[in-house]
Swiss-Prot record:
Protein name stated in the entry: Manganese catalase
Pfam families attached to this UniProt entry: Mn_catalase
Temperature-activity profile: Optimum temperature is 55 degrees Celsius. Exhibits a half-life of 2 hours at 80 degrees Celsius.
Keywords: Calcium, Manganese, Metal-binding, Oxidoreductase, Peroxidase
Catalytic reactions on record: 2 H2O2 = O2 + 2 H2O
Keyword flag Metal-binding: yes
Subunit structure: Homohexamer.
Length: 273
């Protein structure tokens, strides 16, 4: 069950309208690593968690907060658009310089959403459920969460550098702080799970069923041997085994030869040599 609180978690009020920045801000709302993605990712991970209540609660707490961030950013986008009426934009566009700036406005904001946010990226790509990861393996999922928070915080930091609007910067500063917390919480949870299960996912798959002679080889597939200079090659792998550097990749299989397709699929016939 969800209960909506009408107050925002943090203020989301720009100092002035900026349709172009509203378009840019769509990325951290409906882009691949935007707030919609992390909210839905954590929700489905939480709903699918079995028998690990403390992690389920962590996921649901974080997911619910992220829904609030969706609301904050959507509000900010709407406010960046609301005081810039279309007739004023048309008049301003008569100036070539201003016109070139307004020309970058997301037309969806005017045509589709009526000066409101959209569930899409800064380039108008609709948000997709294919962005989220919810595998049922918490260690794998928490690593995906760490990546999502890392990419998301990176994008927020870049947006922070693109504006001098104090109101926008204030909200972005808050989001940066919360992403710092979320990165740290996933790092801590990953460390805890690795201590229980080992660092390789899935830790439940029998090692005897994998070709272990290849399990810790760093294979050189390119010219030169710069990759051999990794300091960690001289240390134990995170799972306790020894690394091995292979300076030249070898082939262990045969040249693949496929049978001709059946006539009913109408493939190109094999060529004659």
């Amino acid at each position: 069950m969800f209960k909506h609180t009408k107050m925002l978690q943090h203020p989301a009020k720009p100092d002035r309208p900026d349709p172009l920045f509203a378009k840019k801000m769509q990325e951290i709302l409906g882009g691949q690593f935007g707030e919609i993605s992390v909210a839905m990712q954590y929700l489905f991970q939480g709903w699918n968690t079995r028998g690990n209540e403390k992690y389920k609660d962590l996921l649901m707490d974080t997911a619910t907060e992220e829904l609030g961030h969706v609301e904050m950013i959507a509000t900010m986008i709407a406010r960046l658009l609301e005081d810039a009426p279309l007739d004023q934009q048309e008049k301003a566009a008569e100036d070539p310089v201003i016109g070139s700036i307004l020309g970058g406005m997301n037309p969806h904001h005017a045509i589709v959403s009526g000066l409101g946010a959209m569930p899409e990226s800064s380039t108008g790509v609709p948000w997709s459920g294919g962005y989220i990861v919810a595998s049922g393996n918490l260690l794998a999922d928490f690593r995906a969460n760490l990546n999502a928070e890392s990419q998301g915080r990176l994008q927020v930091a870049r947006l922070f550098e693109m504006t001098d609007d104090k109101g926008v910067k204030d909200m972005l500063s808050f989001l940066l702080a919360r992403d710092t917390m979320h990165q740290n919480q996933w790092l801590a949870a990953i460390k805890e799970l690795e201590a229980q299960e080992g660092p390789v996912v899935p830790g439940t798959f029998p090692k005897a069923l994998e070709k272990q002679e290849f399990s810790h080889q760093l294979i050189n597939f390119s010219e030169g041997e710069e990759s051999a200079k990794q300091n960690w090659l001289n240390e134990k792998a995170p799972d306790g085994e020894a690394f091995e550097y292979v300076k030249e990749a070898k082939t262990f299989g045969e040249k693949p030869e496929l049978k001709p397709a059946p006539p009913c699929v109408h493939n190109t016939l094999p060529g004659r040599e």
